[in-house]
Amino acid sequence: MSRRSTALLKTALAAVHYTGAGNLLAPYTRGAGVIFMLHHVDPAPPQPFEPNRILKVTPEFLEAVVREVIDAGFDIIPLDEVRQRLENAESERPFACFTLDDGYRDNRDHAYPIFKRYNAPFTIYVPSDFADGRGDFWWLTFEKVLRAASQITLCMYGETRHFRLSTPAEKDAAYHEIYWWLRELPEAQARAVVAELAAAHNIDPAGAHAGHVMSWDELRQLAEDPLVTIGAHTRGHYALAKLGARHARAEMAESIDRVEKELGRPCRHFSYPYGCEKSAGEREFRLAAELGVETAVTTQKGLLYPEHAYEMTALPRLSLNGDFQDLRYVKALLSGVPFALMNTFKRYAGARPAP
């Protein structure tokens, strides 16, 4: 999301909160439930240049959200119960699920104690390569390159581009421009570009992020608690829609099989890496259904409605991220009013509204 879009969304959410529209309309717009999405839960203060801080929330904010959800009358449930709750939405209280992508060690160290304190079930989605200790955290490697460099040169869109990196602001602007260009490239090519930049600046991608994610042994130990569910997140964290059908299926199937083998229990839940429309679509939703998972989640923004019982491999989530660490925004989103307004706009614009 661009800075301008982020600012506009914050303004809209604040308006929903302060006008009282959320409280007034929630009974009609709230829907059946919500699946929250997180990545890092980290108490460290933000750095001057830290573009991936959007993936981080503080433990204090997470705990505030958990309390807000409970106080608002939501039941916090495991993903295993989502279908049943959607099918009986009219007779049930609203529900919330908490999910965390990638299997970062801070999930265990900082998020787990909070969920344990409130007896709140949660799911961690794990790319099997990450748990094996050989994951490619290219977005973090790229951040590390820009932090170390004073300038870089790249061939982008067929022309040579020079980026000055003298200040945090210059580094931040360069990161966002280049990041979205990389996201448009084929997966292998994008990762090769970052690997070449890392080599040119004497950065070892494998060593740069050692210790960031949990090993299989750590995941097994964590999963001994019945509050914890471990789901699959592909092998190598690829944008599946960019892959051929056979490759995409293998990424999904082998990660599901690996989670089952390592934990000794069925793997019933899946998360699409990146999860946006360009990264996961109808083909991937169909593959997930064919592979037998009970739920598969995207990063598409939205709440859950009874109709989602028929789209269990294309479920939206509500992101808890570093740009929106404010309970006003969470309350506004939980009301469902922003999504009702978005759907109204889509209807007038001729687009297909969300369920």
What are these regions (language model features)?
Residues 67, 109-116, 195:
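A broadly conserved amphipathic alpha-helix scaffold signal in soluble, globular proteins
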Residues 2-99, 106, 137-146, 153-154, ...:
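C-terminal active-site subregion of NodB/CE4 polysaccharide deacetylases
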Residues 36, 41-42, 93-96, 116-278, ...:
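Metal-dependent polysaccharide deacetylase catalytic core of the NodB/CE4 family, i.e.
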Residues 101-108, 118-123:
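Conserved beta-strand->loop/alpha-helix structural units within folded catalytic cores of enzymes
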Residues 110-114, 218, 283-287:
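A short acidic, amphipathic alpha-helical/loop segment
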Residues 64, 106, 110, 214-217:
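Short, well-structured alpha-helical interface segments that form or flank functional binding sites
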